[in-house]
């Protein structure tokens, strides 16, 4: 049950967490997490606020509409835990790098590089482990960002096919070592 708050600007809409509470938790156990533009805005990657909510969950679900919001689901192969959620959001941002509104892929790479550097060594190691369940271009992009920041990238490099090229709209200025990772 949600009681809307009234302000001088009118009635406030509920926050995405309130609208999607039943998709995020079941019987006190985490079963999903908010990702997509809502999460990317909270990470500082975009300033756009959207009426669509993307939820990462371990099982497939069809999109649905709730009030003014369109809720869609992203199937997540990794376990969803409190500790993993911020790391999964970083990987999701890399996955959707071309689709994040009001931001250039170059600025996103720089911001994600800063976020990854601020993680502890254990979190960085866990990020690499979680990346193994993502597509190869996400692993290549993560590897290039981590290598640029002098972080360990050996397992990411080994997980990639050395002959595959990735066409991503990222400049040499943002990622000078992109050719090492076959990013064109």
Which sequence ranges carry the predicted segments?
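Short beta-edge/loop segments at beta->alpha junctions of small alpha/beta modules
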Residues: 1-25
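Secondary-structure transition/turn motif
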Residues: 4-5, 75-78
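Short gly/ser-rich loop at a beta-strand->alpha-helix junction or flexible surface loop bordering the NTP-binding
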Residues: 5, 27-66
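Alpha-helix boundary/capping detector
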Residues: 8-9, 65-67, 116
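Alpha-helix C-capping/helix-to-loop hinge sites
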Residues: 23-27, 97-100
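Structural motif
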Residues: 28-34, 77-85
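A short, charged helix-loop
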Residues: 65-75
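Hydrophobic alpha-helical interaction segments
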Residues: 80-184
